[in-house]
Swiss-Prot record:
One of its GO terms (molecular function) is acetyl-CoA C-acyltransferase activity. This is Putative acetyl-CoA C-acetyltransferase VraB. Gene3D superfamilies: 3.40.47.10. PROSITE patterns: THIOLASE_2 (PS00737). It comes from the Bacteria. The keyword DNA damage does not apply. It holds the Pfam family Thiolase_C. It is an enzyme of class 2 (transferase). It comes from Staphylococcus aureus (strain COL). SUPFAM superfamilies: Thiolase-like. Keywords: Acyltransferase, Transferase. InterPro entries: Thiolase (IPR002155), Thiolase-like (IPR016039), Thiolase-like_sf_Thiolase (IPR050215), Thiolase_C (IPR020617), Thiolase_CS (IPR020613), Thiolase_N (IPR020616).
Length: 379
């Protein structure tokens, strides 16, 4: 079986919903990343077999294909857009790696993009062509209509209740995320991930959601979103805009082209869970991944779990017995933000730049009751 390696990874800084990036469509968010890869790796770009991107609330029309054409890549390069909800970006990386393992191609661009600010409004279509009532807008995607179809916030509350994750634990974890993120912005770790872009004449190179100086006591002042609950705006991620791209190729080819370091994809797992508890998806996903590769949690140096809600990450940490020295050691989405279709690819990008780590996992809890996880080693 061929081996797939990630040899380059970059992302935009993540903008807040309605923030600096609010006027940019998904393909426009991706354009500077594609252009960066074109300029830095011209010999490789000419050999691309496919572009695979995750996206959840975009404007349709196969964003991967639209974006590569907008960026000026050859029209002979195909593109495919994947929707596995929040896990789409990680799924795109696994898809590309598996295609290489199977011998279907040797060079792929994978990643993800989301503009929550530019997400189209959706209107329910009437059953009758003669309908005269005012149109009804969809408030959100329906994740599991045949079940109780909880919102993501209700799902986080369900997880918090089942796994006894208190409000205090959730606020403590959120504070940790902001502190670690701020530290790793200051020391330059996170800046390695980010490609500065010019937006309306200004350089944009810092995640807008980060609150580096928020006092710890402030987290307890926020009211629960659901009456009587524990999930608040402070211990949940924000809605965000942003894009991520990774260059993935067959290992021998990477060496031939002069790439000397990166991530080796070892394996990936996607599972289903009760849709009422979507945030717990990383637990069986990571457990299955470890079992399949004859590893234990202690064998993994870094585990990146997307921080949609403090409740779900704390529950996963407790269920898997993950130490603080392993989990989200540069902070996470509670501070940096969660552009849905890009977030999984961002986790892998973060692992890419942890040059002193050897064995790593990225994992996502996914709306509708899913979880995915991928195992990487350094090459």
């Amino acid at each position: 079986m061929n081996q797939a390696v990630i040899v380059a990874a970059k992302r935009t800084a993540f903008g807040k919903y309605g923030g600096t990036l609010k006027h940019l469509e998904p393909e426009q968010l991706l354009k500077p990343l594609f252009q960066h890869f074109k300029e830095k790796y011209p010999e490789v770009i000419s050999k691309i077999d496919d572009v695979v991107l995750g996206n959840v609330v975009g404007n349709g029309g196969n964003i991967a294909r639209k974006a590569l054409l907008e960026a000026g890549l050859k029209d002979s390069i195909p593109g495919v857009t994947i929707d596995r909800q929040c896990g789409s970006g990680l799924e795109s990386v696994q898809y590309a790696c598996r295609m290489i393992q199977a011998g279907a191609g040797k060079v792929y661009i994978a990643g993800g993009v989301e503009s929550t600010s530019r997400a189209p409004w959706k209107i329910k279509r009437p059953h009758s062509v003669y309908e005269t009532a005012l149109p009804e807008f969809y408030e959100r995607a329906s994740f599991a209509p045949e079940m109780s179809d909880p919102s993501m916030i209700q799902g986080a509350e369900n997880v918090a209740k089942m796994y006894d994750v208190s409000r205090g634990l959730q606020d403590e974890f959120a504070y940790r995320s902001h502190q670690l993120t701020a530290e790793n912005v200051k020391n330059g770790n996170i800046s390695q991930e980010i490609l500065p872009i010019t937006v309306k004449g200004e350089i944009f190179n810092t995640d807008e959601s980060l609150k580096s100086h928020i006092p710890k006591d402030n987290f307890g002042r926020f009211k629960p979103v659901i009456k009587g609950g524990t999930v608040t705006a402070a211990n949940s991620c924000m809605k965000n805009d942003g894009a991520v791209l990774l260059l993935i190729m067959e290992k021998d080819m990477a060496y031939e082209l002069g790439f000397e370091h990166g991530l080796l994809f070892k394996d990936g797992v996607t599972v289903g869970v009760d849709s009422n508890f979507p945030g717990i998806g990383p637990v069986p996903a990571i457990s299955n991944l470890l079992k399949r590769n004859q590893l234990t949690i202690e064998n993994i140096e870094v585990i990146e779990i997307n921080e949609a809600f403090s409740a779900q990450v704390v529950a996963c940490q407790q269920a898997l017995n993950i130490s603080n020295t392993q989990l989200n050691i540069w902070g996470g989405a509670l501070a940096s933000g969660h552009p849905y279709g890009a977030s999984g690819a961002q986790l892998v990008t973060r692992l890419f730049y942890m040059f002193d780590k050897e064995t790593m996992i990225a994992s996502m809890g996914i709306g509708g009751g899913l979880g995915n996880a991928a195992l990487f080693t350094r090459f």
